[in-house]
Structure formats: C-alpha cells, structure tokens
Amino acid sequence: MIDSQPVGGGDVNQAFKLTTTDHQQYFLLMHPSDSKNFYQQEIVGLQLLGQTAKVPQVLANGMWGADAYLLLSYIASQPFGDQYALGRGVGKIHKRTSQNGQFGFNVDDPEGRTTDGGVWYPDWQSFFINERLEVRKRIIMNRHLWTGAMDARYQKAVAHFKALMKTHHSTPSLLHGDFWSGNFMFDENAQPVIIDPTVFYGDREFDIGVTQVFAGFDNEFYQGYQDEYPLDDGYQERLPFYQLYYLMLHLGKFGMEYQGSVKRLLRSLA
C-alpha cells in the first residue's frame, strides 16, 4: 500500500480509500469492536442486493487490532447520474421476496438501525409496529425525548396505520432498509450503485417512504420505480408512517434536533 486517504464513512465507521503500489484501489471500513462479525449484516446485504443491482464487492473482513474491518472494491463516483435507472433497479430488488413468506431477517444489525436478527413475523403490520416503531419509541423514551402528548398522538397514529392496512396486502420484499440519498451513488458511467444496506424483508413501501424524508431523489427516480413495479393504490396515505419511523430513528440517535419533525408528523397522522 502506498496511500491511505480518509473519506466519508457515515456516522458510524471510519472509512479510507486505499491505493496499492500497483495502483489498485480499495474501500476500507473500520469500527471499534470485539467481534469479527460486526459487518456481517452489511456483507449479507451487499451479497443479496448484488444479485440484482450494482454494489461494491466484498473482498475481506475480520479484525485489525481492536477494530473490525470490511474491505470493499472501490468504485469511482460522480454526483449526478441516471435516477430513472436507479428507480427501476430498486423496483427489481423489491420483486425479490423472502423464501419463508414472512417478514424480518436472520442477521443482527450491530449499528442499531434495526432489531436483532432471527425475528420473523407472518404479517407486516405486527412486524413494523413491534420491531420498528416500538423499538424506536423505547430508545427515545430512554433519552427522555418522548412526551405524554407525543405518546397520545402516537397511539392514534398506530390505530390509523392499522385501519389503513386492512385494505392493503403486504408482500415480504427484499428491502435496502436505510435507503436515503447517502446510500446510493453513481459510477463513472452515471449508473447507480447501491451502498450501506440494512436489508430485511418487508413491505416495499417502507423503502419508498424513507426516500421522501430527505432530499436527493428526483421525479425520474419515482417514475422509474413506477414503470418497473407500480405501487398499490393508496400508497400516498401509508408512506408517512414509514417516514415517521425514520424520523424516530434519527431522534433516538441524534437527539433533540429531530423532535420537532417527529411531533409535526405525529400531529398529521393522529
């Protein structure tokens, strides 16, 4: 190796672009951990998504001193690319479903974005409420950022979600699980590359709802998705509940700056 250059690795990992003496380039993620399996969830996710979409190739993982590491192929990127192709690609991913016909996943996410692996439910409504919303709520309560007024609106929002789900059939699709604009990029040919997954099997509207929380997806993305795998009637009413989950995740992780957004969304859903 002749060069190690720090690059953005998200809010959890240290990340480096490595260049070797023969000019090969690699992407290295590192995180303090006592387990060589720290990145197992991401590895499995990349392997699953890579059967349908372009993703970084997993080259090696293990321990380096007191840090877990994950070595990936390096993909040169550019800021703009084919969002229509991105939408179609996500639609193709969502067409893949769980082998057992249930909702969940079987590998832990050590970064805390999801629940423990090995949790499966026969219905999406119960999985989403128990393993997503309620988990986030407990974390927020432990940080003393959950008020009585928020809880009253939350209970009404959950009842509203249950009512909407009575007329919607959920299929356990393969999901990225954390699909905001920081988790895709475009290669040198302007083609989409999917990164940093937290995969599980769930209703595909979950991923689409998350895309709408922060900027980064344009109309071409949604058109591409609809052309590949049209969303079911009434999806506009259901997407805000997945936005609520994602904002609750950020409130529990990053603190007070997201409380106002959660409160406003709860008011609109109650």
Please state what every model-predicted region is:
Residues 241-250:
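Short helix/strand-capping connector loops at secondary-structure junctions
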Residues 5-126:
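ATP-binding pocket architecture of kinase catalytic cores
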Residues 33-34, 63-66, 75-77, 133, ...:
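Short, solvent-exposed loop/turn segments at secondary-structure junctions
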Residues 250-270:
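ATP/Mg2+ or Mg2+-diphosphate-binding catalytic cores
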Residues 53, 94-101, 140, 165, ...:
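A general structural signal marking secondary-structure boundaries and capping sites
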Residues 117-129, 138, 171-174, 181, ...:
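Active-site Asp-x-Gly
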Residues 98-174:
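An alpha-helical support segment within catalytic cores of ATP-dependent transferases
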Residues 1-3:
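Juxta-kinase regulatory segment immediately upstream of eukaryotic protein kinase catalytic domains
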